[in-house]
Amino acid sequence: MIMEHDHDEKYYSGCLYDKQNFWRFLPAKIFLSRVSIADEYVDSLRKLSKKGLIIYAIKQRSKLNSLIIYELTGRKGLPLPVYSHGANMSFWQPLPEMVKFLWSSFLRRFQKKQKALLGKLAFMERTFAEKSSSIIHLGESEFIESRSADQAISSLIKVQGMVDFPIFIVPVLVAYGRRRENENESLINILFGQAEQTGTLRRVITFIRYSNQAYVIPAEPINLSSYLKENKDRLQETIIHDLRGELIGRIEEEKTAVIGPALKSKEELMGMVLSDETMKKFITDFAVKSKKDRVVVERDARRYLYEIAADYKETFVEIWIKILTWLWNTVYDGLSIDHEGMAKVRNVSKKMPFVIIPCHRSHIDYLLLSYVFFKSNIQMPFIAAGTNMSFFPMGYIFRKSGAFFLRRSFRGNEVYAEVLSKYIAILLQEGLPLEFFIEGGRSRTGKMVMPKYGLLSMIIQAYQEKYCDNFAAIPVYIGYDRVIEEKSYLDELSGAPKVRENTAQIIKSSNILRKRYGRVYINIGEPIIMKSYLESQEKQIEQMTLEERQSLYRKIGYEIELEINKVSVVTPISLVASGLLSHDRRGISHDELTDILNEFYEYLSTRKVKFAATFAHRERAIADALNIFVQ
């Protein structure tokens, strides 16, 4: 039974109130209101709140993170927490309530410590029983004792046994931006703490600086009622420990999905490649075979690594994202993104490294997926780019943004091939996501080009050599109403030689800013979980001959392209273009074109073809497409 207490016993330091317009809170609200949460998370929390009580669980015992959840839930119309266990929120209470808390606190000083604690726990349990949401703090790790967390979970278990509604504990990731953690400790980190275990001062400074990049991600909730039924034969102490560990683990999974693993520097990754045992053996064997000094072969390997390796820097990514946001708004009419597909990518990224394999239509592809992943709170991949894109300044910018460069052809150069293969293997070993274009170059016609399976074979070989336990190959469709290279593509299809990419071309292409290129479409295919896929083959890859392995790589390449085709869409522009091209005379009336387009649409519908989301308003979509043609 939950104890009843007198009037003063309802004022505690952790209390939060449904008043956010008092003067002390308003300046903080300027920064707090910048914190974002995706609409799909808001919808899922609203649905969850109709089924039972929501308890928000965060890792650090942080007043700031408690305030972020407090303001965000108020702004989004979600269940507002009325209590933050273990955090002193008295400064953020309205003045009358703060004065009452101070008086109650003064009176409690004359009580025995144990009685005061029991009163506080009874208040918290009463709050839970009244179906009022609260915030609990889990601590940094399940292996580090947290009496506050154990008290909160114990109280939740007690209340769950007394009420007729389920309690949902929602683990919440609160992050102030997308910066990856570095393995090397800087002086700043030594003084103020790493991003994860930071002190109060650095947390506040970091939040103020990056508040416009801060976000909240609720992880998969735990239904406490179901959890207790599943673990009814275990000791409560064990249940509390394991439940706390599970909640912390779910927050860590979300963090990994967004930020990725701790990142080593370019030099450290290169050192790992050169010190790899199979790499060292290759260098020794190749030196003997080619009758060269081992030092010479190792020097060549290091030189190739410098040519290949990415040099990821957060600052460049942050600047680049701002430029790309402006570019998309200037050149395109919006991005149509497969949010369900992106959720699949997020779920995969929590469990294993993943390899994004998109079709290739435009140089914009290099930038687009990284931008979409950033905005979708998914860790950005390291992108395999051709050396044709390594010209200054774009090559420098791409390399700093996570691109690594490879030659179009390196047949006969065994050292280069081994270095590239081992670099990819080390990236996978570090749990870093990759991206490469299976067609090799850009398709000039919009149709899929025959797959090139060189990089795919290197990635599968890295898995086979145990550099990673598993990985997912994720096919991605990227479609454009118009590509910015349309003029050069027409020239090439008419017989003109391909012009090599250079700085002058970038300057000349500035006139694209005067045009609109319609929408961009991104759809995610079904991920191929490579371990399961390879185990399902009649013959295991270890038992295959070289020819059989190459045949398998080709098969996987074609299956990836088939999956990309499955999720490709008919766009309004492509439908209108087909209608215009089907007409054999020079001019066509609007009514006649409309009849043709309706006929095409009905035919494609009967064939179960996927249409772009913009077809939800078909007449407007076709009108917009016609406007692009008459620019």
Predicted features and spans:
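Membrane-interfacial terminal anchoring regions of lipid-handling membrane enzymes
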Residues: 1-631
